Amino acid sequence: MALETLTSPRLSSPMPTLFQDSALGFHGSKGKRSKRSRSEFDRQSLTEDEYIALCLMLLARDGDRNRDLDLPSSSSSPPLLPPLPTPIYKCSVCDKAFSSYQALGGHKASHRKSFSLTQSAGGDELSTSSAITTSGISGGGGGSVKSHVCSICHKSFATGQALGGHKRCHYEGKNGGGVSSSVSNSEDVGSTSHVSSGHRGFDLNIPPIPEFSMVNGDEEVMSPMPAKKLRFDFPEKP
């Protein structure tokens, strides 16, 4: 069909008016009309190659025109996209909102710090109250709480350490400390208790033996503080 159309006698006929304007643009410069009159083209006839080239040129020009209509103008601004929703991070303790997870983490760290300070303050108050209670029990002596009782004098103590120290006093008194204290309390013995405190195994009810010192060979002098005067029995004269 295309060959028959190309070889038809209408090709030798003068070019229609529609193709004359296109032929002007084809032979001359683009966008400018030739100065030659239209009658000159009417008298000319197109060859087969020129006709095919003219048809292709018209088709290409028509396609470019439709493409320009479909494309939007470059001067128009692109459509604005809606802003993305900002993520919100809320604190589970005080319900405060933050824009980032890092800010929320720093805020939670302050909560943990304040909680640790409060807990340590509560522990200090508890230890102080327990110390006051212990001191009150040990100062009272005869309080209602008797956790540690001495088996010798039946005194009560708040802690086992205090009871151990108290029993140590009992043991040291048996070894020699108690002898010195009992001798010092007696009125009859007086200052001789300091001399006799180092001796062991004697009865306190028996008065001490007076001490004598030799002065100038034969003179006997009694101690300055005798416990009791000695009596001498002399035989009667006949």
UniProtKB/Swiss-Prot annotation:
InterPro entries according to UniProt: AZF1/2/3-like (IPR044653), Znf_C2H2_sf (IPR036236), Znf_C2H2_type (IPR013087)
Biased composition, class Low complexity, residue ranges: 180-193
Gene Ontology annotations for the cellular component aspect, listed alphabetically: nucleus
ZnF endpoints (C2H2-type): 89-111, 148-170
Keywords from the named record: Metal-binding, Nucleus, Repeat, Transcription, Transcription regulation, Zinc, Zinc-finger
Location of region: Disordered: 1-42, 175-202
Pfam families per record: zf-C2H2_6
SUPFAM superfamilies: beta-beta-alpha zinc fingers
GO biological process: cellular response to hypoxia; phosphate ion homeostasis; regulation of root development
Motif (Nuclear localization signal): 30-38
Signal peptide from the UniProt entry: none
Polar residues bias spans: 1-15
Keyword Repeat: yes
Annotated GO MF terms: DNA-binding transcription factor activity; RNA polymerase II cis-regulatory region sequence-specific DNA binding; transcription cis-regulatory region binding; zinc ion binding
Induction: By cold treatment and during Pi starvation.
Superkingdom classification of source: Eukaryota
Location in or out of the cell: Nucleus
Role description: Probable transcription factor that regulates root development and phosphate (Pi) acquisition and homeostasis. Probably acts as a repressor of primary root growth and regulates Pi homeostasis through the control of root architecture.
PANTHER family per record: C2H2 TYPE ZINC FINGER TRANSCRIPTION FACTOR FAMILY-RELATED
Note: Seeds silencing ZAT6 fail to germinate. Plants overexpressing ZAT6 have retarded growth with smaller primary roots and fewer leaves.
Official protein name in the record: Zinc finger protein ZAT6
Organism: Arabidopsis thaliana
Lineage, top ranks: Eukaryota, Viridiplantae, Streptophyta, Embryophyta, Tracheophyta
Gene behind the chain: ZAT6
